[in-house]
Amino acid sequence: MKHEHPDRLMNRTPLSLAALETHDAFAERHIGPDAASQQAMLDTLGFASRAALIDAVIPASIRRAEALPLGPFAQPKSEAEALAALRALADKNQVFRSYIGQGYYDSHTPAVILRNVLENPAWYTAYTPYQPEISQGRLEALLNFQQMVVDLTGLAISNASLLDEATAAAEAMTLLQRTGKPKSNVFYVADDVLPQTLEVVRTRALPIGIEVKTGPAAEAAQAGAFGVLLQYPGVNGDVRDYRALTDAIHAAGGHVVVAADLLALTVLTPPGEWGADVAVGNTQRFGVPMGFGGPHAAYMAVRDEFKRQMPGRLVGVTVDAQGKPALRLALQTREQHIRREKATSNVCTAQALLAIMASMYAVYHGPHGLKTIALRVNRIAALLAAGVKQLGFTTVNDTFFDTLTIDAGARTAQLHAFANAKRINLRRVSDTQVGVSVDETTTRDDLADLLAVFAQAAGGTAPDVDALDAGLPGVAALPAGLERTSAYLTHHVFNRHHSETEMLRYLRSLSDKDLALDRSMIPLGSCTMKLNATSEMLPVTWPEFGRIHPFAPSEQTAGYREMIDQLEQMLVAATGYAAVSLQPNAGSQGEYAGLLVIHAYHASRGEAHRDVCLIPASAHGTNPASAHMAGMKVVVVACDAQGNVDIADLKAKAEQHANDLAAIMITYPSTHGVFEQNVREICEIVHAHGGQVYVDGANMNAMVGLTAPGQFGGDVSHLNLHKTFCIPHGGGGPGVGPVAVGPHLAKFLPNQRSTGYARGEEGIGAVSAAPYGSASILPISWMYIAMMGAKNLTAATETAILNANYIAKRLAPHYPVLYSGPGGLVAHECILDLRPIKETSGITVDDVAKRLMDYGFHAPTMSFPVPGTLMVEPTESESQEELDRFIAAMIAIREEIRAVEEGRADREDNPLRHAPHTAAVVTANEWPHAYSREQAAYPVASLVTNKYWPPVGRADNAYGDRNLFCSCVPMSEYA
C-alpha cells in the first residue's frame, strides 16, 4: 500500500505511529511508476486497474489462488530493518583465519578497486558487452584480464572468464575431446588435483561417456588418455617438474591440462613454457574475497591451435568505421546463442565483474608488486616449514609455494583443537596430517600464532620469527630449474597505474566509456535489467560474508546456512516447487543441473535409456547446449504462426519418441513474450509419454506472485537470481542459477561429496566448485525479497507486465508487435518486427541498435528469438518518464527511416547507417554527410543537457574475426 503524502497526514489528528510507518517504502523505490503514472498507462491500454490488465494477460487456468506463502517474510521490511536482520545473521558467522587452502585464499581487495569497481553501479549494473561501441571500458578491462592470464600462463590466448576452477577444468576436458578426435574416451586426473575439481569433472564426464581415471601424476602417460589434468602446485603443496611427463603424454597421443595458481606463476616457470596445451584456474586470490565459495573468475588459456574451440567469451581487437582500434567480443559463432547444441559450451553469464576486479588487481600492483606479494607468501611458508621442523614435525612436501602438508601423527586432533582456540582453521588432510596454506593477508603475527599452535601441540617453545628469518636462505623450496625467468605483464597498462590517483582516474576513464543502468534503461528482452538497489548490494562487502572459506567448519557458518535456508524457502514459495539447490553459479549451470536431475530420476526407475529432449524452435541457446552437455539428444518442436508451441507437432514428436522421451524444455512466458494459453496441455502431453517438464525460469519476472511453474505442470526449473531477484549482471556476470524441483526430484539435487556436503545418497554430483556456488551474492536476493514482501513482489510483476504492454501499445503504430496473446497483449516483454523496414529502406536491425546509442540507449535484444527483430523488456523499475524517453527515441528513429523510404534521405548516407556518432566525428573539421551534425549528435532536444557519447564508431566484426588479436593494444595504435 502506498503510504500517504505527509501533507495529507498532517491534517489528521491524532497521528498514530502505524500511520507513519513506511514498511512499503522500499517497494516505492524499486517500482518505477508511481500510482498516477500507472493509471495513465492503464488508461492508454484501456484498463481501469492493474488487476484488470493482469486478468486479461495471464490465463485464468494457471493463476495462483493464494498470496505468495513467504511465511515470516510475507510482510515487507524497511531497508534499515532488512539490513539489521541480515546483520544479525552475518554476526552468527565466525571469521577465523583460514589456512585451509584447497584453491581458496584470503586476499586484500585494494580499497580503490573495492570502492570504484565492486561498489560502483557504473560497473556492476552493465550488461554483457554484446554492443561493443557502448562497452569499451569493460571490454578493455576484460582484455587486460586476458593479457594477464596469457602472460602468467605462457600460453597463446585466453578467454574473458569462466565460472570457477572446477568447471573450467571440466570445460578443458570437453575441449580436448572435441578437438583431438581421440580414439580413447579416458581423461586422467592426477591424484593431487583439488578434490572439488575432480568431483565436478566426474559429473561432467558421466553423461557424455568419458571415463575419468585417477592416479599418480607419474603414471599419466601410461593411462592411454586423450587428456591429462595436472595441478601446479598440487593440493598438498608439492611443486613438481612436469616437463618430461608432458613430453611423454604428448608422445602417447594425449594433451595436457594444467590447473595453475596465477600468483605462483609469478615465480614458477609457466605451464606454457613446459608444454601444457591448456591452463585453467581461479583468479580469486587477485583481490577477490573468498565469499564462502564465490563468485570468482576462473580462467582458461590455450595453445593457438585451440582458440576456435575455447568456451566462453573472448575479447578481441578490431577497427571501427573510422579505422581506429575498437574492442568487441570475438568468434561469437562458437557460443550457445548462435551454435546452440553445437556450441563449445553452454556458458552464457560468466564472471565478468570478478574478472575485472582481478585484472585491476594486476594493473594496480604491476609485475613487481605481484612478484613481491608472491615472494612474501613463499617466504612465510618457508619460515613456517623451518619452524615446525624445529618443533619436531615432518613436512610431507619438500617443495612448495604457499602450502605445507605436515605430518602430526597422534598430535593431529590436539593440533586442530589448539588452532581452533586461536580462531585458526587448518586443512584436515587425514587423521595424521594437516595442511597449512598461507596467503597475502598472513602477517608476521599470524605466523607467530601458527608457530605457537604447533609448539603447544609439541609441548615446546615457538621459534622466534626473526631468528628463523635470519637463518633462512633466499628463495626457498622452489625446485631447481622451475624458477621463472621470463618477463610478464610488460604492457604499459600494468606498469603505469600504481599510484591511487592514477588508478582512480583509469577506472573512471573506463567506466565513462560505458552505458550502464546508472545512465539509462537497458531494455534487453529476456535479460531483466532491473534495479540493483544499493541496500541490496551493501552486505556483499561485509567481512562476515566475504572472509568465510567455503570449507570452513559448519559451526563457523551458521549465519550463512540460515540465510541460505531462508532464501531457498523464499524461492520454493515463488516457484511452487518443493526444494531448491543454490549450488549452480549461473543460469546455464542451473539448466544443466536440472537436466542431470531428470536423468537421475529416470535412471532410478530403470529408464536410464530416456535421452530425448524436446526443445521448441524459439528456445534460448543455452537450452540445446545444456541438453547436449547432459548427454541428451535434441529434437526440435515447431512453433505456430502465433509463436506458440505447435501442439500437433509436439504430440507427434512425443508419440514418436515415447520410449526414450526424457524431457521437454519450455520457457514461460515464452521467448516470444506471450503467456501461452495451453501450457498445461503441453505439460500433460509430455507427462503422458513418460517425460519430465523443464520450465526455463529466465522469464520468472513475469510470474512471481501471479503463477508458478511448479503449480501448472513443471517438474524442474532453474531461476536467474541475476534477473528476477536483483543480483546485478556485472557486465557479464556473476550470476546465480538455482535449480528448483518437485517433490519427486528433491533427492536428486546436487551434492558435493568431496567436501562432506550431501543432500542424499541419490543426489547428482557437484556442478560447481563450492557447495553453495556463488554464496556471497545470495544476500542480494535475500534483501530484495525481505524488503518487498509478498504483496509488493506481486506488484512488481504486475508493473513489469504493465510497462511492457505500454511500450507495445505506444510503438505498435510505428513497429509491428510480432507476437501477442488474447486482446493483443504481451507478457513482460514484446518483440518489434523490423523486417518490413529492411525491405522498404535497407535499414537493418543493427542500424537501429547503433542509432539508439546516439539517443543514449542500449539497444533491446537483437534478432532473438526471431532474426530481424528487437525484443524489449522494460522491467518494473523504469518510470513512465524513462519509458516515454525510450518510446520517443524509437519513434524519432522511425521517422529517420521514413525519410529514407520516401527518398528524403539517402539509403547509405543517413544517420542510421553511420551510427553511432562519436564526439571526434561530430567535431571534425570535415563533415562529409548530407544530414547535419546536430541530427547526428542531438536528434532530440533532451540530449543537449545530458549526452552520452559512444567512444568508438561502429565496430567491424568481420575484420576482427579475420584478424584475430586478443591481447592488449600498444598505445601507438590509439594515436
Swiss-Prot record:
InterPro entries, per the entry: GcvP, GDC-P_C, GDC-P_N, GDC_P, PyrdxlP-dep_Trfase, PyrdxlP-dep_Trfase_major, PyrdxlP-dep_Trfase_small
Cysteines engaged in disulfide bonds, as pairs: none
Reaction(s) this enzyme catalyzes, per UniProt: N(6)-[(R)-lipoyl]-L-lysyl-[glycine-cleavage complex H protein] + glycine + H(+) = N(6)-[(R)-S(8)-aminomethyldihydrolipoyl]-L-lysyl-[glycine-cleavage complex H protein] + CO2
Alphabetic keyword roster: Oxidoreductase, Pyridoxal phosphate
Molecular function terms from GO: glycine binding; glycine dehydrogenase (decarboxylating) activity; pyridoxal phosphate binding
A biological-process GO annotation: glycine decarboxylation via glycine cleavage system
Modified residues (N6-(pyridoxal phosphate)lysine): K723
Cofactor field: pyridoxal 5'-phosphate
Origin superkingdom: Bacteria
Protein name: Glycine dehydrogenase (decarboxylating)
Organism: Burkholderia vietnamiensis (strain G4 / LMG 22486) (Burkholderia cepacia (strain R1808))
Taxonomic placement: Bacteria, Pseudomonadati, Pseudomonadota, Betaproteobacteria, Burkholderiales
Gene name of this polypeptide: gcvP
